[in-house]
């Protein structure tokens, strides 16, 4: 029999209290106190400011003891002369009395046994990783995400959630990743090794009780857990199709968040559940309901009081905003509406009677998460400004004390010029001869004149306004007057796709535009080009500049977000000699971009030793995930120093 309601694991503390007769006198009054505390919280949450989160308890403040419903009071002690009684089974009836907003139809005995075992044993199934540096403190870490490579990926979020958990597991942590099991025919093979766990739960939300099941694969020392529901089985991309975003995305990712909260309590992975002492790492709006659920539906009943949550913002532009009328569908207590409340500015409202009221998933996590991380230090500052905060800048500014930035890493198993299977020739920082050969092969593949002396500039990315394609379009006529070659790879706005095709016909010996995307081609362009151009208007982190430096390709970028953090402008007169790994220009104008490109091209032609120094400094930078994982460990430890979020 499987758990059939959210919070199935919340009875674990009560099970342990059966052995403590001293609590019997208090147990009968706990339900009344719970109702009184809910009234007090309701009054407090109603005053929650739209500009900032509720005040947190002082660090020395201790949480109230777990609430124990009267019907779970421990039985009277047995007479001394009689043998020790066996533990009575938990009652199936009356569990719903825990709280009006917490529905349980029954608890499986095997789930309860698993929770008891986890209370005394938190060892993970992590394999030996002697070659990796180990963390001083190891924890149980639960990633919650809408995508993770290689199972499902639509962008950088998938890369991060497919690599960072592996890096943390290699450092000794027990790591679980919870994500949807997307099935649309072509992706079915991605989950071929994931096995059905025989565990399922029923989630009360959106006007009904929705059953989800769990699949599991153990790979690279990580427990990959896939939440299965019919809403994840449809054609199209992960979040939408040709007609736009799916209309039920709020429902789909509400299910994911509930399931992620239950998975550590009910899934026996490697023989043990993860238990209640976890670090939840929630990624973007898809997982942002998790910290709210922990604070609203678990901690008030003694569950997950030893757990913490970290929100990772990969792109603040996507916040999961839906009409305010959908809040009751989320299954949260009414008094928690303030945590998710969102009001659109007047200019964004559709008509005069539109009040602009909405719920914002990401805001809920910003309010309730214990720590907040952006994917670069520069982006952590930008999100607190009116220009980059996407409406959440004041709230994020109020949480500066728990806001940090960590630059993403790259998978050096996939991105390594010494072993890359996509390259015709290999090279290293000690022997760069293979890079010139890769350039010649790329020129042949593209039908460009094979010339070692001409600078070859590349662009890889989406063809849209955010990536600065309009600036490239305006700069190309002037840039093509130079002795230069330019190659672009990407897809996106049909207008820019058509422009790429027409520009190629206008500059047949200088310009090539590849509409679409190909992983092998992106590797060959990264290795074969001399310069990589990234004029993004905003870039939370950016990975292409990291790939470029790893391959000895010099980046020319707009100085924003993670680009500013990772690319150091060339300085021939540094304190220790020549410094820098590329050029970061600002402000974002065509003239500034052309100046940076011409400076780079001049250095390439006239100062070969300096150019080689630029290449080697970029190749020796530590872009590994292990470096990023070490910084995440510090964030986790800071989170556990403070008390968890409570109302």
Curated annotation (Swiss-Prot):
Transmembrane segments: none
First-listed, main subcellular location of the protein, grouped into a coarse class: plastid
Keyword Transit peptide recorded: yes
A Gene Ontology molecular function term of the record: alpha-1,4-glucan glucosyltransferase (ADP-glucose donor) activity
Biased composition (Pro residues): 66-91
Catalytic activity: [(1->4)-alpha-D-glucosyl](n) + ADP-alpha-D-glucose = [(1->4)-alpha-D-glucosyl](n+1) + ADP + H(+)
Cited SUPFAM superfamilies: UDP-Glycosyltransferase/glycogen phosphorylase
Binding site for ADP-alpha-D-glucose: 153
Signal peptide: none
Keywords of the record: Amyloplast, Chloroplast, Glycosyltransferase, Plastid, Starch biosynthesis, Transferase, Transit peptide
UniProt transit peptide range: 1-41
Family matches, as Gene3D superfamilies: Glycogen Phosphorylase B (3.40.50.2000)
EC number(s) given by UniProt: 2.4.1.21
This protein's pathway: Glycan biosynthesis; starch biosynthesis
Ranges for region Disordered: 66-95
Pfam families: Glyco_transf_5, Glycos_transf_1
Compartments it resides in: Plastid, Chloroplast; Plastid, Amyloplast
GO biological process: starch biosynthetic process
GO CC field: amyloplast; chloroplast
Family the UniProt entry places it in: Belongs to the glycosyltransferase 1 family. Bacterial/plant glycogen synthase subfamily.
The protein, known as: Starch synthase 1, chloroplastic/amyloplastic
Species per Swiss-Prot/TrEMBL record: Triticum aestivum (Wheat)
Gene (name only): WSSI-2
